[in-house]
UniProtKB/Swiss-Prot annotation:
GO biological process, one term: L-arginine biosynthetic process
Gene field: argC
Name of this chain's protein: N-acetyl-gamma-glutamyl-phosphate reductase
Highest classification ranks of the organism: Bacteria, Pseudomonadati, Thermodesulfobacteriota, Desulfuromonadia, Desulfuromonadales
Superkingdom as given in the UniProt entry: Bacteria
Native species: Pelobacter propionicus (strain DSM 2379 / NBRC 103807 / OttBd1)
HAMAP family named among the record's database cross-references: ArgC_type1
InterPro entries in alphabetical order: AGPR_AS (IPR023013), AGPR_type-1 (IPR000706), NAD(P)-bd_dom_sf (IPR036291), NAGSA_dehydrogenase (IPR050085), Semialdehyde_DH_NAD-bd (IPR000534)
Compartments reported by the entry: Cytoplasm
UniProt cross-references to PROSITE patterns, sorted A to Z: ARGC
Keyword NADP on entry: yes
CDD domains referenced in this protein's UniProt entry, alphabetically: AGPR_1_C, AGPR_1_N
The EC number(s) this enzyme carries: 1.2.1.38
Length: 346
């Protein structure tokens, strides 16, 4: 059995990791940490874990955590992961990091969007953990930067078009709508029930959302040249899920049928990407609680523009599910281990 620690276990992504890992046949969770709930049993913080996990949440002490685990999931806010990562690396631990701290390959870009990076030398040793694009680079890696939720939905939605050089790189627009868990478990006025319920709003408008450079970095690597896009996130009054609607101008005429075949071929061997049949469109309801990304490419016959719709669960394929998928790849486990559950519907 692989002994695993979850650092930052009292947030939504921490809970989701526990939910998945307790059904994983080759993993034992041996340590959970939380600064705000240290000393409490994890099933006190999350009653859904009663009779399944009674570990006591500990303060984060990197050396102590390392003594208890072979692989560590860091589900911490940005900057917090940077503070402990050097110790984990020096002690030879494998880390799947769910923060933004190691996703951007350029420390200057990270500094411009977040704050100065505390250990830029580790950026070179980290791999961006989007399995459908970077699987071979992930195998055996010591530090995997788990992708953000919006970047996952958009990158998977555009990858076939970019790899085949089919669209105008200056024409990309992505509108993405997320459930409230995307804002985390901390108390925020903007996340209160009365602030969110019965409403639908855009935020981070004008290219200022912090996922923007991550999206552009990955799209540029796929295209082989610089890509910029217009990205507008939205908040929807639902617990979980992301629906991205992506627009681009094709370089030559193409039909919906041709795109559907292109996408089916591109993702034919992928266990967690489902290209929907012609006439079907993704819904967050049909991926909720699962690690699937549902995709449908469509051509607007009037304008000729390509429209790609993708749906994921932001806590699963957008965070914890993908983190476990990365762990499986790193460790040589069956890639779908612990992740074979279908969506929770209705």
């Amino acid at each position: 059995m692989l002994n695993v620690a979850i650092v930052g276990a009292s947030g939504y992504t921490g809970l989701e990791l526990l939910r998945i890992l307790y059904a994983h046949p080759q993993v034992a969770v041996t340590c959970v940490t939380s600064e705000r709930s240290a000393g409490k049993r994890i099933d006190e913080v999350f009653p859904t874990l009663r009779d399944r996990c009674s570990l006591v949440l500990e303060n984060l002490e990197p050396v102590r955590v390392s003594q208890k685990a072979d692989l560590i999931f860091t589900a911490l806010p940005h900057k917090a992961a940077m503070a402990v990562m050097p110790t984990f690396m020096e002690l030879g631990k494998t880390v799947i990091d769910l923060s933004a701290d190691y996703r951007l390959s350029d420390a200057e870009v990270y500094g411009a969007w977040y704050e100065p990076h505390l250990n830029p030398e580790l950026l070179k040793s980290a791999v961006y953990g989007l399995p459908e694009i970077r699987r071979e680079s992930i195998r055996g890696k010591k530090l995997v930067a788990n992708p953000g939720c919006y970047p996952t939905s958009i990158t998977l939605g555009l990858a076939p078009l970019l790899k085949n050089g089919m669209i105008d790189l200056k024409s990309i627009i992505a509108d993405s709508a997320s459930g409230v868990t995307g804002a985390g478990r901390g108390a925020k006025v903007d996340s209160l029930y009365c602030e969110v319920n019965e409403g639908y709003k855009a935020y981070g408008v004008g290219g200022v959302h912090r996922h923007t450079p991550e999206i552009e970095q990955e799209l540029s690597l796929l295209a082989g040249e610089k890509v910029t896009l217009t990205f507008t996130p939205h908040l929807v009054p639902m617990d979980r899920g992301i629906l991205s609607t992506i627009y681009a101008t094709p370089l030559k005429g193409v039909t919906t049928e041709e795109l559907n075949e292109l996408y089916r071929n591109f993702y034919a061997e992928e266990p967690f990407v489902r290209v929907l049949p012609l006439g079907s469109l993704p819904s967050t309801a049909f991926v909720r609680g699962s690690n699937f990304c549902d995709i449908a490419p469509v051509v607007d016959k009037r304008t000729g523009r390509v429209i790609v719709v993708s749906a994921i669960d932001n806590l699963m394929k957008g965070a914890s599910g993908q983190a476990v998928q990365n762990m499986n790849i790193v460790c040589g486990f069956y890639e779908s281990a612990g992740l074979s559950g279908l969506a929770l519907f209705p």
